[in-house]
Amino acid sequence: MGFNEFLSSIFGNKSTRDMKEIQPWVDKIKAAYPEVAKLDNDGLRAKTEELKEYIRNSASKERAKADELRAGIENVELEDREEVFAQIDKIEKEILEIYEKALDEVLPVAFSIVKESAKRFSENEEIVVTATDFDRTLAATKDFVRIEGDKAIWQNHWNAGGNDTVWNMVHYDVQLFGGVVLHKGKIAEMATGEGKTLVATLPVFLNALTGNGVHVVTVNDYLAKRDSEWMGPLYMFHGLSVDCIDRHQPNSDARRQAYLADITFGTNNEFGFDYLRDNMAISPKDLVQRQHNYAIVDEVDSVLIDDARTPLIISGPVPKGEDQLFDQLRPLVERLVEAQKVLATKYLSEAKKLINSDDKKEVEEGFLALFRSHKALPKNKALIKFLSEQGIKAGMLKTEEVYMEQNNKRMHEATDPLYFVIDEKLNSVDLTDKGVDLITGNSEDPTLFVLPDIAAQLSELENEHGLSDEQKLEKKDALLTNYAIKSERVHTINQLLKAYTMFEKDDEYVVIDGQVKIVDEQTGRIMEGRRYSDGLHQAIEAKEGVKVEAATQTFATITLQNYFRMYHKLSGMTGTAETEAGELWDIYKLDVVVIPTNRPIARKDMNDRVYKTKREKYKAVIEEIEQLVQAGRPVLVGTTSVEISEMLSKMLTMRKIEHNVLNAKLHQKEADIVAKAGLSGTVTIATNMAGRGTDIKLSPEVKAAGGLAIIGTERHESRRVDRQLRGRAGRQGDPGSSVFFVSLEDDLMRLFSSDRIASVMDKLGFQEGEMIEHKMISNSIERAQKKVEENNFGIRKRLLEYDDVMNKQRTVVYTKRRHALMGERIGMDIVNMIWDRCAAAIENNADYEECKLDLLQTLAMEAPFTEEEFRNEKKDKLADKTFDVAIANFKRKTERLAQIANPVIKQVYENQGHMYENILIPITDGKRMYNISCNLKAAYESESKEVVKSFEKSILLHVIDESWKENLRELDELKHSVQNASYEQKDPLLIYKLESVTLFDNMVNKINNQTVSILMRGQIPVAEPTEEQQEAARRVEVRQAAPEQRQDMSKYREQKQDLNDPNQQAAAQQDTREAVKREPIRAEKTVGRNDPCPCGSGKKYKNCHGRNS
């Protein structure tokens, strides 16, 4: 007995402990159910209203307190509002916690209501209830409800996903168990066919009672629409509104209404993009989402793990975005690749001759030639076949070890004769000197594709005597420009090389309608709108001869993980999460609970069948399919790429075996094909995991013949994906079988495992065509998968660590932006900006005259202290003094601005208010004129204070957006440039974190400076009017402002950037980042107004010693 087994025998395994924890809840539900079942139909619905009322009342005191604080905010001084808002935020958190306790209290009754409703719909064709206003509204648009007099008649059949569906489901005990797990914010792992969709109805119904909204997140729009239609009537019966965001256009009123529904269905991408769009909005009317309350993520492993390397990006055009070198440099790369192919073939034929020699030295030379051929083109089919022969791969690996000794000291001897070197495991391509010579050719500049040592050149320039500062600056600019041009050229060559040597059409991507579209390696589906990053996608477009898309700039970005982390409560469902439980806990603190099946699984999972070559393997697959079809069993064949699915299709057509193909090119009929995949003798070829969420139902004849047969044509890198394929068979206790066919030429085996298995096969004397099937082999393959999973987890975690840096910045910026947009907290933010600006002017200037100039430029004020005071007084006291004067000036100027605007506003509103909704007010800061749109009625009622608020809002939004966009670009450049730190034995992430803090500080300072400078100088341009002008003013037609503009999203592109590409995994080969001017790092830390006081009281500095200074 192992140590883990020993511990399990004492404490029980995790599954048992989870069951023990949840079982009392299930017992409570069962105890509450008989009372609920006694209620008539109206009583059942009334019970729901009773629960809603109970939950609302549970936090009524707290809500009243928060409302009272909000109502009195206008009477609080600007400087003190921050504390009031902090109190409001604290109460809002308390309300959420109170609601959670109330939900736990009503859970048994709420779950019983859902179960009883499901039972009544399954047992009755019609349910008659007293009609409510909600019923009458529904009856106008839904065909499953009709009104007769004062009665509403609900039918038990409706359209879901294009099919007429009769409700026939009632919750099992294990589904109640799953419902509790989801409500508790955990992941429920349930086997295929166990009714995950029905399980979700329990926690969705319960949490929707709060009125704060529940989001049900799915992986594709078909499932989102189908599930909202399928489960919707069960919720609507109890007066809960249901909608699906994927039915409506982004930024539309319909999309906003969908978010206001009690229950909102949608795809993960659309939820994420709506969040980004909301944070680019220019009016509160543009916002669609409300608070992130509770989300249930269907197929949670796919969203939180498979998509983990894929940030959502909204990008827009950049100046000169059409300029690119890909088409221009493509012929050079094609020449390079052709030359390498000739070289690789030559080395391979040399190796074949020399390895069979009796001379030991010649054998060594043969294995070196083989190693060179492998480094030249590792995917060469002839090479892969030769490596599968007895003893060949082991010999090549020994040769590799010789050259890898002492930190790759001799590796250049092996690779110098090549034009470029490919490392499959690192996903990298490196150009050699020989390759550079080939593409440079007869060029006048032999260093055309060689990056100069910019640091050394700049150092030489600094030490060069006899040059004026101006001449040095000119030379420096020329050096940096030359470096940037060469850097772009080298980068383009590298990306084109990757496109030609590491990315294959119909495997990693497909070309449809003149566009390169990425095929998701996990699902086999086309990832619409997703692009490889860093120019790789453009390189593939150039390779395929399609239009190379223009370069874009990121305007807003977030990873799905960081989006879903914003929810107050998050849970998920999947058939396979146990293998990734560690990652889900590490990153999201989500616990995986395995839900037992309702009936025992009867599927037979066989050991892997291993062959030496792919040819033998596919031949065996076809023979296996033929036998299963003859036995009358349906067969689902899982493949890892479009190319393999098309090849198997051709082989089956030659054998005259009828079949359906489901891959990235033929995905339109997915639901139909998968639904028919259970018919007797049906063969369905599908790329991995296609059809998730659609059950394959079997007829009695098929069950008698042995059920659905799953054939995997290759082991995937992830055990989870293999488990998902196996899980298609054996639903609800049905019979079935699964088996994987593997060859030593498969990518997983070739890269991670085949040397050990190959040596076993060599020792046992297996010949070509023979198959090995043994538990030891299956275990060895699983070990290889674990190795890859660990590597992929490392990559995902690393990328998340990079995004976490940006996420902290994004949270700060988007919070400030939302304050400006909504207007409620804008005054508080401006006060803090003025304080920061005052403190910075005192802190950053050692000279009195410089300090005076700084205050004049940014705060438009004279220094409120003498030179002597500046030298002798404490800095914090000077800052406080400056701040008091600045705030007084700011209040005086804003009051003056309102006074000047008010007569005009009053006149227009009283004479022409019925004609105009908004008015444009011209305001200038002395440098630029701003036309500020303001609501006429609000301006009139507030005596033009609304004009000031609109001015502040417009300026703050403009400055934040421009600064954040620039910061994103700099962070992007920084991320690439820090990779070079690994060559200096430094951690690039650490350097990134340190440098990004400096960038962020610079951005915040820039936002503060620009905002304060414009607001402090803002005034309505007026001149003393003549009598004629006064008379004309009385007759002037007022210029009407257009209705407040909606954000036009059409110029932006939404995309999912694929971070699972070589650029993100391998260290960047050159520093592409332009030199950025850095502020000196200051050792001493200044205490901000809102920082904790250094005295240790726990109060904010401004309320403690900051006030006493």
Swiss-Prot record:
Gene Ontology CC annotations of this record: cell envelope Sec protein transport complex; cytosol; plasma membrane
SMART domains documented for this protein: SecA_DEAD, SecA_PP_bind
GO molecular function annotations of the record: ATP binding; metal ion binding; protein-exporting ATPase activity
Compositional bias annotation for Basic and acidic residues: 1045-1059, 1071-1088
E.C. numbers: 7.4.2.8
Compositionally biased spans, kind Basic residues: 1099-1109
Keywords annotated in UniProt: ATP-binding, Cell inner membrane, Cell membrane, Cytoplasm, Membrane, Metal-binding, Nucleotide-binding, Protein transport, Translocase, Translocation, Transport, Zinc
Pfam families listed in its UniProt record: P-loop_SecA (PF21090), SEC-C (PF02810), SecA_DEAD (PF07517), SecA_PP_bind (PF01043), SecA_SW (PF07516)
Topology of this chain in the membrane: Peripheral membrane protein
Protein family according to the UniProt entry: Belongs to the SecA family.
Known partners and oligomeric status: Monomer and homodimer. Part of the essential Sec protein translocation apparatus which comprises SecA, SecYEG and auxiliary proteins SecDF. Other proteins may also be involved.
Protein name: Protein translocase subunit SecA
Taxonomic path: Bacteria, Pseudomonadati, Bacteroidota, Bacteroidia, Bacteroidales
